[in-house]
Design a protein with these regions (language model features):
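Juxtamembrane intracellular "pre-TM" segments in multi-pass secondary transporters
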Residues: 13-31, 225-298
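Central cavity-lining transmembrane alpha-helices of secondary-active solute carriers
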Residues: 78-95, 336-348
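Conserved MFS/SLC helix-loop-helix module at the cytosolic interface between two early adjacent transmembrane helices
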Residues: 89-125, 129
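Helix-breaking motifs and short loop linkers at transmembrane-helix boundaries and internal kinks
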Residues: 102, 124-129, 158, 325, ...
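Cytoplasmic helix-loop-helix junction between adjacent transmembrane helices
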Residues: 136-173
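Intracellular juxtamembrane helix-capping segments at the cytosolic ends
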Residues: 144-157, 403-424
Length: 498
């Protein structure tokens, strides 16, 4: 019997699933480029709406809530902390939920609904508790979109192409991170709240349309079973799409991480999870992987990356005001040189990770940041020459920030994939990837939370120049840990260990 029009419509909208009836646009909706673009737009929306609201928060608290000026800073900080805290708490929850569901689309849409609710509450809210709940919902949305989005990317492109994919996505979303605060302040100044939230709802509409249309490859393959003659990229697994890059990365990993005896069995034994695991480890199977120092170092790299970003976010506006008497709009312009190189060089460094491995890129990037951060001691109050010096050093910092984006995510994904390959029964069919990126999102959010606090305390107690000296020392320590653990222990250290 031919399927009814209603069945076709429900299948197309993914409301009802009948694998004997293909949804409209199956090929392009399950295409690698469309899936990755959907993830990129989701992450862009999250960061854009976060940045769009931040410059408006002080005015919202004063005009709509009536917060006195002397309590404004503490309330703004509290709303920022509510966002970060919710991301920390809900990231692992999002990972566990996603790995227990048959598809990624449902939790991906759940995150968008949380963001929609948050935006409506921010637009209409006129009390502090409502604004706090709205920021918590924004944090919940961030936890889901980053956790599910990164897991979906890995499943779509495979580990061999993950570096350049993440680099390209981060490059794209950095546009939102750069433009949103400037646009939010400008729209509020010219149009008030309707203009700010009008563009927010427009971007949410585009994001919703893409998320409802996207079809995961593993879901699309179930439709293709009834039509094996279909010509799509569905029959090409991520491993087949790596154009030899995985062979190169595998060879490098073998060179760096292979036991000195060269035994494949011994290599796999390092990733073997014993059968004697507590109940919580079977409920959350990513937990045994946390004993791996490489994975812990990958998380540390993500934490330091976020802490550096939070450091710049917290100090650039105050330095611009203290040194050069800049207002909020001109302070925002100083973020452009910092983010421009991230936008341009993100895909290149992602390609370098896929081509040369995580160790050289992470070590070089963090080592490069050491002298650049130390040189940030040079700018002082003054005229155009000092402004140009500060802007130039921020641009150089942007190069380093572009280099540290991809290695931690790619390294963590590669390690957990190895655990999954050696212990497929322990992890189940879906694997622990959403749990992995849930933890990664949690660590990153913690870094974003600590970064501004640490930067503010250090700047007040020892000065801006010495604060950057401390951050440079942290980058040097991180580079050393990357050299030892990321990509596997170097042979010379492995021999000494034996």
């Amino acid at each position: 019997m031919a399927p009814s029009s209603l069945t076709k419509l429900l299948n197309t909208l993914q409301i009802h699933t009948d694998y004997s009836v293909k949804p409209a646009g199956l090929q392009w909706r399950s295409n690698t480029l469309f899936i990755v673009s959907t993830v990129a737009v989701g992450l862009f929306t999250d960061l854009f709406l976060y940045g769009l609201i931040v410059p408006v928060l002080p005015s919202m608290l004063q005009d709509k809530v009536g917060v006195p000026k002397d309590k404004l800073q503490s309330n703004v900080s509290g709303l920022l902390a509510a966002y970060a805290g919710a991301s920390v708490v809900f990231s692992p929850i999002a990972g566990i939920m996603a790995d227990r569901m048959s598809t990624r689309q449902a939790p991906f849409l759940l995150g968008l609904l949380a963001l929609l609710g948050a935006t409506i509450m921010l637009f209409l809210g006129e009390s502090l508790p409502v604004l706090v709940v709205a920021r918590v919902l924004q944090g919940v949305s961030a936890a889901f979109v980053w956790t599910i989005g990164l897991a979906l990317c890995l499943e779509t492109v495979g580990p061999g192409n993950l570096g350049k994919t993440i680099g390209s996505i981060f490059s794209f979303i950095s546009v939102g991170n750069l433009c949103a605060p400037l646009l939010g302040g400008l729209l509020y100044d010219k149009t008030g709240y309707p203009g700010v939230f009008g563009i927010a709802f427009a971007i949410l509409a585009v994001d919703f349309l893409m998320r409802i249309l996207v079809i995961e490859k593993k879901v699309a393959r179930k439709y293709e079973v009834n039509d094996p003659s279909s010509v799509t990229d569905l029959n090409t697994t991520p491993d087949d799409q790596q154009d030899g890059s995985e062979d190169r990365s595998d060879q490098q990993e073998a060179d760096e991480n292979q036991p000195l005896l060269g035994s494949k069995e011994e290599d796999e034994a390092a990733f073997k999870i014993s059968d004697n695991q507590p109940k919580i480890a079977r409920m959350i199977p990513i937990l045994p992987c946390l004993a791996d120092p490489r994975l812990l170092t990958a998380f540390l790299v993500a934490f330091i990356q976020a802490m550096l970003l939070g450091n710049f976010d917290a100090t650039i506006p105050t330095v611009a005001e203290d040194y050069y008497n800049f207002d909020s709009l001109h302070s925002g312009i100083l973020f452009l040189p910092l983010g421009a190189f991230d936008l341009i060089l993100g895909p290149f460094f992602g390609w370098c990770v896929d081509r040369f491995g995580t160790k050289p890129v992470s070590v070089v990037a963090y080592t490069y940041l050491v002298p650049v951060l130390i040189l940030l001691r040079l700018p002082h109050p003054g005229g155009m020459s000092q402004i140009l010096l500060y802007g130039g050093l921020l641009a150089l910092s942007g190069i380093g920030l572009a280099g540290i984006g991809a290695p931690s995510i790619v390294e963590a994904g590669a390690i957990v994939q190895k655990y999954y390959e050696v212990n497929p029964d322990f992890f189940g069919e879906e694997g622990p990837y959403a749990q992995l990126y849930g933890l990664n999102s949690m660590v990153f959010s913690a870094g974003l939370t600590l970064g501004p606090e640490l930067a503010g305390e250090l700047k007040e107690s020892i000065g801006y120049g010495n604060m950057n000296l401390v951050m440079g020392a942290i980058c040097l320590i991180t580079a050393s840990l990357c050299f030892v653990y990321i990509g596997g222990m170097p042979k010379m250290l492995a021999r000494r260990k034996l």
